[in-house]
Structure formats: C-alpha cells, structure tokens
Amino acid sequence: MFFFGFLSATMCYWTSHRTTDYSYIVLSILVIILIWYLILICCRSKKNVVINNMPPSPPPYTVSSSYS
C-alpha cells in the first residue's frame, strides 16, 4: 500500500503545472543537445570521407646518391 501511495503522490507532483513546465524545458534542452550532437557527428564523418578519398601525397623529394 505504501508503494501505491508513494506512486500516486509522485504522479500528483509530476502533473502539477510548474513541474510539467520544468520537465518540458529540460526535455527541450535535451532534444536540442541531441540534434546538435548528431549534426556534429554527421559533419565529422563527412569530413573523414573527404579526407580518406583524397589521393595520397607524393613521397618527399630525395636526392639520389649516384651521380651519372
């Protein structure tokens, strides 16, 4: 019985007007952070694809030791 009383009190607390506004604000911030993080990951993966598809750099110029 104590559990159900605690659950109903908790539900009453979370459905009060101020708390629902607060929870919506926190949820909105979390969604914005998630979208920003996904965009960041997408940009990084696209940058890596461009870098990986570039042709390899030529070997450094070396002077040969034989004189002909």
Swiss-Prot record:
Organism domain of life: Viruses
Transmembrane segments: 21-41
Keyword Ribosomal protein attached: no
Gene Ontology cellular-component annotations: host cell membrane; membrane
Location within or outside the cell: Host membrane
Main location: host cell
UniProt KW keywords: Host membrane, Membrane, Transmembrane, Transmembrane helix
Topology in the lipid bilayer: Single-pass membrane protein
Family the entry assigns: Belongs to the asfivirus KP93L family.
Note in the entry: Encoded by inverted terminal repeats (ITR).
Protein name: Uncharacterized membrane protein KP93L
Organism: African swine fever virus (isolate Warthog/Namibia/Wart80/1980) (ASFV)
